[in-house]
């Protein structure tokens, strides 16, 4: 046979001719569970799935014709296999869809597990409170995932003084269930303020590990509040039901959990304004009250004063107690103010300098990445007690 070099298009066209010319793949019927329905530009894309296989399908113009597919239903689909040359992929072009009188395997598993947890009262347990200002956050996800990067980016943007602990696990595939359980158990050993479980979007099958009963039971054993951010918009996984808070995406979960430093400053400013106004109003009110009381006493004749000397002394005693009470309230408010000041000071970006860290600046701007520097650059090193110049040599 002669050697011949094919282009990618030629190979894909040849495969297309083979498959679309095969009578066993034309005008055939396939049954399976409907999953991952995605209307797009008037067409409907979806998958037919069974336990270990998936067939990508499309109904051209189906969305415009008002066709609405039901996730989890078993269906008999008629059509032909086609090859999409630009991507080198094949899919099933549907001409007709008929529902079968039963639900699919994944839907049965989902409903069975959910019902079992409901009967045990595990879905109605009291939710743990997510702290407003967490300092130590555990993240259960793949260390290489975009979901983890979304959380880290959000933390940087919000300039939050937090520590992040990553517990690596696969989030789909054959090993995901076992790895996820190990990660959950490991996180439970740490002294954390809360745990986030995050991953990007995917099909029902991709997200299935978050419906596994033993994974759900392990989540329920966590001592810490749990926030999920599993990237899906339509269907919820069971992990969302048992979490203390569930968000649609990793970024949404991060924004819910991680406080924004600027918002903290605004809250403190608002609190201080209200505190000062409240104290001022209370002092003014009590001052007017005492002045009125003193004026009334002066209007009483001397004889009346002599007869009511005991009452006057009582009034003085009450006035003294009132002043003491006001001072006690002021001291309590002052303690709150000092506590808020300490919290504000903890957000000071220069505090780490007192622990031996150094702030690097180039042309007055803080250097955040090593890629921002090149050989020969002159930088300023800011220590807690002063600034030194340095030159990058490598």
Swiss-Prot record:
Predominant localisation class: cytoplasm
**Entry-linked InterPro entries:** Exonuc_VII_L (IPR003753), Exonuc_VII_lsu_C (IPR020579), OB-fold_nuc-bd_dom (IPR025824)
Q: Where are the transmembrane segments?
A: none
Presence of the UniProt keyword Transmembrane helix in the record: no
Question: Where does the UniProt annotation locate this protein?
Answer: Cytoplasm
Q: Which domain of life is it from?
A: Bacteria
- Enzyme Commission number(s) from the entry: 3.1.11.6
Catalytic reactions on record? Exonucleolytic cleavage in either 5'- to 3'- or 3'- to 5'-direction to yield nucleoside 5'-phosphates
Give one Pfam family.
Exonuc_VII_L
Keyword vocabulary terms for this entry: Cytoplasm, Exonuclease, Hydrolase, Nuclease
Any GO BP: DNA catabolic process
MF (Gene Ontology)? exodeoxyribonuclease VII activity; nucleic acid binding
What does the entry list under GO cellular component? cytoplasm; exodeoxyribonuclease VII complex
Q: What class of enzyme is it?
A: hydrolase
| Keyword Membrane carried by entry | no
Q: What does this protein do?
A: Bidirectionally degrades single-stranded DNA into large acid-insoluble oligonucleotides, which are then degraded further into small acid-soluble oligonucleotides.
Family assignment from sequence similarity: Belongs to the XseA family.
What NCBIfam families does its record include? xseA (TIGR00237)
According to the record's subunit comment, the protein's assembly and interactions are:
Heterooligomer composed of large and small subunits.
Specify the protein name. Answer: Exodeoxyribonuclease 7 large subunit
* Organism of this sequence: Thermotoga petrophila (strain ATCC BAA-488 / DSM 13995 / JCM 10881 / RKU-1)
């Amino acid at each position: 046979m002669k050697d011949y070099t094919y282009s990618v298009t030629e190979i894909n066209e040849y495969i297309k001719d083979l498959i679309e010319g095969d009578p066993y793949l034309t005008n055939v019927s396939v049954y399976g569970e409907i999953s991952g329905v995605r209307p797009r530009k008037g067409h409907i894309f979806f998958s037919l799935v069974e336990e270990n296989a998936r067939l990508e399908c499309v109904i051209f113009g189906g969305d415009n014709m008002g066709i609405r597919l039901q996730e989890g239903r078993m269906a008999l689909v008629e059509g032909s296999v086609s090859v999409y040359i630009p991507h080198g992929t094949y899919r099933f072009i549907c001409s007709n869809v008929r529902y079968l009188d039963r639900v699919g395997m994944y839907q049965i598993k989902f409903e069975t597990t959910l019902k079992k947890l409901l009967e045990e009262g595990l879905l109605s347990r009291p939710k743990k409170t997510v702290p407003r200002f967490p300092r130590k956050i555990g993240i259960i996800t793949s260390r290489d995932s975009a979901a983890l990067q979304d959380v880290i980016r959000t933390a940087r943007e919000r300039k939050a003084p937090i520590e992040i602990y990553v517990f690596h696990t696969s989030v789909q595939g054959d090993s995901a269930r076992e790895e996820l359980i190990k990660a959950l158990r490991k996180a439970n050993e740490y002294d954390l303020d809360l745990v986030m479980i995050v991953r990007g979007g995917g099909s029902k099958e991709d997200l299935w590990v978050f419906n596994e009963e033993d994974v759900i039971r392990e989540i329920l054993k966590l001592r810490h509040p749990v926030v999920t951010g599993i990237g899906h918009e339509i269907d919820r996984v069971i992990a969302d039901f048992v979490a203390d808070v569930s968000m649609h995406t990793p970024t949404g979960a991060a924004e819910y959990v991680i406080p924004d430093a600027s918002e903290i400053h605004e809250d403190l400013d608002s609190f201080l304004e209200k505190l000062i106004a409240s104290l001022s109003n209370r002092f003014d009110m009590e001052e007017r009250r005492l002045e009125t009381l003193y004026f009334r006493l002066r209007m009483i004749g001397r004889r009346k004063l002599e007869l009511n000397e005991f009452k006057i002394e009582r009034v003085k005693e009450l006035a003294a107690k009132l002043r003491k009470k006001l001072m006690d309230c002021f001291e309590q408010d002052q303690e709150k103010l000092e506590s808020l000041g300490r919290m504000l000071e903890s957000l000071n970006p220069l505090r780490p300098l007192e622990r031996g860290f150094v702030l690097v600046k180039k042309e007055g701007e803080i250097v955040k990445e090593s890629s921002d520097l090149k050989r020969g650059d002159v930088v300023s090193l800011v220590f807690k007690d002063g600034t030194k110049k340095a030159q990058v040599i490598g």
